[in-house]
UniProtKB/Swiss-Prot annotation:
The keyword Nucleotidyltransferase does not apply. PROSITE patterns: G_TR_1, G_TR_2. It comes from Streptococcus pyogenes serotype M49 (strain NZ131). Residues 139-142 are annotated as: G4. This is Elongation factor Tu. The lineage of its organism: Bacteria, Bacillati, Bacillota, Bacilli, Lactobacillales. It catalyses: GTP + H2O = GDP + phosphate + H(+).
């Protein structure tokens, strides 16, 4: 059989399974792939068993070792990439490094236990890193005889979600058994199909990177005699065309406006540069010393420079090449945003004396220069050129 081309006709969505250890995240992932392969056989829908998902290869993302399984499958209307992080620490690292961007997630809660500490932590992290759409799968319902108990567990989950600003009263809760579905029990297979149609309907199609406002982190700047100043870098999101008005944001106190007079890639003139392209942008009315690496070129008004923010961070363990000792309040490392390092001081949350290598923690940061940041911007924490932590902006403060 000839190899099929990757079909772009279906919208692509990234999702994942989250929840407490042993509540059935990986079993559910296996059940989804297996039931879809039985009910909707296509070249994409191949059954994956628990063992193959559980034996996720180690990946390194920004210097951090993470185990994550990636599986793909499709429904009638969409193509999905699904991530399953086996260990709790892997999940935390995944969320904080932005290694696995999720458009939505399935929160798996065992009906036999109800919400547990990691259930809460995963909901909080989803809120912090901007995963806006959660669907609940109450697993192991075949092991609970009491209908009232199931209702209580559902109420408890909904209350917990509301506590973290998710629409707890309205979001979908599906009750089933991943193991029974995997074993081929048709009643529970139907529930997996119901879960997938809920995912299709409830998790909105993500905005494509090219539809978002322009953001181009500046990597290099040079001047061309007689033509002006060129800034180069990879377009993070959005598009850029000749005659577009842009802003140069970050590092300097004021944001400068300019007009694009040329877009080049591989020394060829382009009509427009798109997200993902490495381009050189010719700017009118900008002197060579008015723009530098670490600033961003952006659509006017779309992103602002800030010095104070809250961040959710993971501090590398000694084994990952991180620090060997804890750090304390007012620790002053470098924060690496996109293309540059900026010194900043860290304020720890009340009641936290110190942070150990391998911990994750919410911190307040104050940078010495303003940088173009927004909720969801990722950064590394560095000391003497080596990475000691990784983080994501959860809230802008000033």
């Amino acid at each position: 059989m000839a190899k099929e081309k990757y079909d772009r006709s279906k919208p692509h969505v990234n999702i994942g399974t989250i929840g407490h250890v042993d509540h059935g995240k990986t079993t559910l992932t296996a059940a989804i792939t297996t039931v879809l392969a039985r009910r909707l056989p296509t070249s994409v829908n191949q059954p994956k068993d628990y063992a193959s998902i559980d034996a996720a290869p180690e990946e390194r993302e920004r210097g951090i070792t993470i185990n994550t399984a990636h599986v793909e499958y499709e429904t009638e209307t969409r193509h999905y990439a699904h991530i399953d992080a086996p260990g709790h620490a892997d999940y935390v690292k995944n969320m904080i490094t932005g290694a696995a961007q999720m458009d939505g997630a399935i929160l798996v809660v065992a009906s036999t236990d109800g919400p547990m500490p990691q259930t809460r932590e995963h909901i909080l992290l989803s809120r912090q890193v901007g995963v806006k759409h959660l669907i609940v799968f109450m697993n192991k319902v075949d092991l609970v005889d009491d209908e009232e108990l199931l209702e209580l567990v559902e109420m408890e989950i909904r209350d917990l979600l509301s506590e973290y600003d998710f629409p707890g009263d309205d979001l979908p809760v599906i009750q089933g058994s991943a193991l029974k579905a995997l074993e081929g029990d048709s009643k529970y297979e139907d529930i997996i199909m119901e879960l997938m149609s809920t995912v299709d309907e409830y998790i909105p199609e993500p905005e494509r990177d090219t539809d978002k406002p322009l953001l181009l982190p500046v990597e290099d700047v040079f001047s061309i005699t007689g033509r002006g100043t060129v800034a180069s870098g990879r377009i993070d999101r959005g598009t850029v065309r000749v005659n577009d008005e842009i802003e140069i944001v970050g590092i300097k106190e004021e944001t400068k406006k300019a007009v694009v007079t040329g877009v080049e890639m591989f020394r060829k003139q382009l009509d427009e540069g798109l997200a993902g392209d490495n381009v050189g942008i010719l700017l009118r009315g900008v002197q060579r010393d008015e723009i530098e690496r670490g600033q961003v070129i952006a659509k006017p008004g779309s992103i602002n420079p800030h010095t104070k923010f809250k961040g959710e961070v993971y501090i590398l363990s000694k084994d990952e090449g991180g620090r060997h000792t804890p750090f304390f309040n007012n620790y002053r490392p470098q924060f690496y945003f996109r293309t540059t390092d900026v010194t900043g001081s860290i304020e720890l949350p009340a009641g936290t004396e110190m942070v150990m290598p391998g911990d994750n923690v919410t911190i307040n940061v104050e940078l010495i220069h303003p940088i173009a940041v927004e909720q969801g911007t990722t950064f590394s924490i560095r000391e003497g050129g080596r990475t000691v932590g990784s983080g994501i902006v959860s809230e802008i403060e000033a």
